[in-house]
């Protein structure tokens, strides 16, 4: 069971585990004025890692085994495939021959799992916190599904921005599977960072990042998209409802060549059938273009004059206008 509690103008209580009337609950901030309470069956692990993050795995009554970082839900067994398939497959199916892929973040292994369904030759994954990988492999192994043992993986434990700043390699696709924009992670959602990523992309390639919920975190979403729009010649937004995120989640794409909604339908269906037929739980060619079909109010929101996320003025989670 999940209880949505709108608490305004009161200050939201601190997030985390709560014992209320003999019930173990998890309180999560879902926005600047919204919190959720979820029934907890069991706490599987809780660790303050060497990277300075609180990493928890919790068995939730509704969503099953779930990963929290700094009290924010990252993935659940119930619906992680919606997020990961939307992040990965529109991106890689837009490419004729995706040889090299870079994932920044992605320590839960879900994006890696989906990338490895494609005929890629090499995947570089740069994760800040090794403990995230170890925790998921131990407590939620269904998500990576053995992907960290794939010989095509080149795993780097380190700062994603520093890697991009010093990287001399080129990639067909760059997938930013990040924690939400708070703390040091805001540096991975700025115009300056996207400009550095752009230099790593081969001709014909593209970048994708999740860009927050389109309702509860509207301003954050707008500012991230604006930064991408001002960096790349081509840009697009997809959205998919992810129940555990309490919102329609946005995915922003940037390219100097082609973005997924511009992909020819015949090519899309052929590539899907050759690479992925029977291997997805959410994504299908029939919904590809629907993911990019935005209602009028969101199209209008993307045209509003908002400041792009920059190093000097980064977008942050739960930002308000």
Swiss-Prot record:
<dbReference type="GO" id="GO:0008295">
    <property type="term" value="P:spermidine biosynthetic process"/>
</dbReference>
<keyword id="KW-0963">Cytoplasm</keyword>
<protein>
    <recommendedName>
        <fullName>Polyamine aminopropyltransferase</fullName>
        <ecNumber>2.5.1.16</ecNumber>
    </recommendedName>
</protein>
<comment type="subunit">
    <text>Homodimer or homotetramer.</text>
</comment>
<comment type="function">
    <text>Catalyzes the irreversible transfer of a propylamine group from the amino donor S-adenosylmethioninamine (decarboxy-AdoMet) to putrescine (1,4-diaminobutane) to yield spermidine.</text>
</comment>
<feature type="domain" description="PABS">
    <location>
        <begin position="23"/>
        <end position="256"/>
    </location>
</feature>
<keyword id="KW-0808">Transferase</keyword>
<dbReference type="GO" id="GO:0006596">
    <property type="term" value="P:polyamine biosynthetic process"/>
</dbReference>
<feature type="binding site">
    <location>
        <position position="84"/>
    </location>
    <ligand>
        <name>spermidine</name>
    </ligand>
</feature>
<dbReference type="InterPro" id="IPR001045">
    <property type="entry name" value="Spermi_synthase"/>
</dbReference>
<feature type="binding site">
    <location>
        <position position="127"/>
    </location>
    <ligand>
        <name>S-methyl-5'-thioadenosine</name>
    </ligand>
</feature>
<dbReference type="GO" id="GO:0010487">
    <property type="term" value="F:thermospermine synthase activity"/>
</dbReference>
<feature type="active site" description="Proton acceptor">
    <location>
        <position position="177"/>
    </location>
</feature>
<dbReference type="InterPro" id="IPR029063">
    <property type="entry name" value="SAM-dependent_MTases_sf"/>
</dbReference>
<dbReference type="InterPro" id="IPR030374">
    <property type="entry name" value="PABS"/>
</dbReference>
<keyword id="KW-0620">Polyamine biosynthesis</keyword>
<keyword id="KW-0745">Spermidine biosynthesis</keyword>
<feature type="binding site">
    <location>
        <position position="108"/>
    </location>
    <ligand>
        <name>spermidine</name>
    </ligand>
</feature>
<dbReference type="InterPro" id="IPR030373">
    <property type="entry name" value="PABS_CS"/>
</dbReference>
<dbReference type="GO" id="GO:0005737">
    <property type="term" value="C:cytoplasm"/>
</dbReference>
<dbReference type="Pfam" id="PF01564">
    <property type="entry name" value="Spermine_synth"/>
</dbReference>
<dbReference type="GO" id="GO:0004766">
    <property type="term" value="F:spermidine synthase activity"/>
</dbReference>
<comment type="similarity">
    <text>Belongs to the spermidine/spermine synthase family.</text>
</comment>
<feature type="binding site">
    <location>
        <begin position="159"/>
        <end position="160"/>
    </location>
    <ligand>
        <name>S-methyl-5'-thioadenosine</name>
    </ligand>
</feature>
<feature type="binding site">
    <location>
        <position position="53"/>
    </location>
    <ligand>
        <name>S-methyl-5'-thioadenosine</name>
    </ligand>
</feature>
<comment type="pathway">
    <text>Amine and polyamine biosynthesis; spermidine biosynthesis; spermidine from putrescine: step 1/1.</text>
</comment>
């Amino acid at each position: 069971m999940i209880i949505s509690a709108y608490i305004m103008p009161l200050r939201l209580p601190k997030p985390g585990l709560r014992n209320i009337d003999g019930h173990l609950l998890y309180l999560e901030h879902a926005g600047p004025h919204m919190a959720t309470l979820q029934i907890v069956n069991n706490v599987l692990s809780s660790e303050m890692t060497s990277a300075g993050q609180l990493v928890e795995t919790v068995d939730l009554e509704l969503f099953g085994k779930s990963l929290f970082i700094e009290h924010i839900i990252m993935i659940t067994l119930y619906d992680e495939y919606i997020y990961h398939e939307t992040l990965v497959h529109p991106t890689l199916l837009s490419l004729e021959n995706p040889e090299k892929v870079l994932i920044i973040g992605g320590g839960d292994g879900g994006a890696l799992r989906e990338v490895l369904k494609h005929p890629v030759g090499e995947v570089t994954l740069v994760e800040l916190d090794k403990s995230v990988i170890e925790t998921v492999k131990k407590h939620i192994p269904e998500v990576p599904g053995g992907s960290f043992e794939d010989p095509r993986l080149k795993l780097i434990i380190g700062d994603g921005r520093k890697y991009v700043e010093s990287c001399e390699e080129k990639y067909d696709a760059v997938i930013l599977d990040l924690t939400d924009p708070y703390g040091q992670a805001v540096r991975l959602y700025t115009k300056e960072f996207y400009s550095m990523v752009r230099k790593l992309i081969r001709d014909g390639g593209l970048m994708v990042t999740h860009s927050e919920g389109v309702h509860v975190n509207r301003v954050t979403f707008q500012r991230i998209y604006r930064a991408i729009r001002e960096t790349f010649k081509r840009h697009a937004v997809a959205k998919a409802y992810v129940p555990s995120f309490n919102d329609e989640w946005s995915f922003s794409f940037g390219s100097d060549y082609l973005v997924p909604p511009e992909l020819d339908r015949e090519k899309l269906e052929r590539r899907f059938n050759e690479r992925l037929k029977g291997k997805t739980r959410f994504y299908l060619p029939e919904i590809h273009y629907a993911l990019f079909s935005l209602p009028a109010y969101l199209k209008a929101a993307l045209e509003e004059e908002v400041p792009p996320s920059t190093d000097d003025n980064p977008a942050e989670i739960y930002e308000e206008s």
